[in-house]
Amino acid sequence: MEDTVIDEYAHFATQIARDAGAILRDRFGQPHEVHYKGTIDMVTEADQAAEALIVSRLRDAYGSHLLLCEEGSRGTVEESPYRWVVDPLDGTTNFAHGMPTFAVSIALEEAGQPIIGVVYDPMRDELFVSQRGGGATLNGEKLRVSATDRLISSILVTGFSYDFGRRARQADTWRDFLTRVQAIRQTGSAALNLCYIAAGRLDGYWERGISPWDVAAGALMVLEAGGAVTDMGGGPYHSDDREILASNGTLHGDLLHVIAAHEDASVANAELGS
């Protein structure tokens, strides 16, 4: 694909991400109608309004492309090399509880490979953009992963499954890392976790039970900023996997070593995350 075409897609995605983000920002802190997709997995009318805007714009502009969206919208075209992967509100739990850490995430894949990723944090007005072979930026400034080369100096981030039994198993890995690193964070937004690695704010991220819309845009961000993204066994990463390990690259082997002592491939089919 020509660079000019990728530029066009990226520009379009940034515009709709900003517009969807404005919906979230305007509704943040207001009373919400909350529905539960599971015991603790929620969706608000803000998710639905932001997704409706994104889906409408994408269908009008690129009606032949496939769509994969968190809140249920799907494309009708069975065969297309292009797929938009959208999370209109990554961090719904934060949003619903009045915590200002959430984002709009939009990715475009060609033949299963990401070619653009856009993540917009409307509360901080931070726009992360990546293009295949073109690097990653934050508000127009080039991003580069951290140079951290020791676990004890690193800050990691993770997330936990909505399944309580699975959380107990995940906690074993968390406890092991906790004795080896400077700190572990949990932001509640997979998309921002990955963008923060790309920006050098965090050094590594692992999680099982995630969905394509959680990580498709952010994974490209990490790669284009010089980092590494694999599955949790060190194999090739695909957005339809339900697991991810991302890092600044330098620490990737150390992270894999710790995870291997705790993670069993049999739990790779964890339920979809937020």
Regions found by a protein language model. Give the residues of each.
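DPxDG-like acidic metal-binding loop motif
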Residues: 78-137, 152
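Small-residue (primarily alanine) positions within well-ordered alpha-helices
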Residues: 13, 17-20, 50, 117, ...
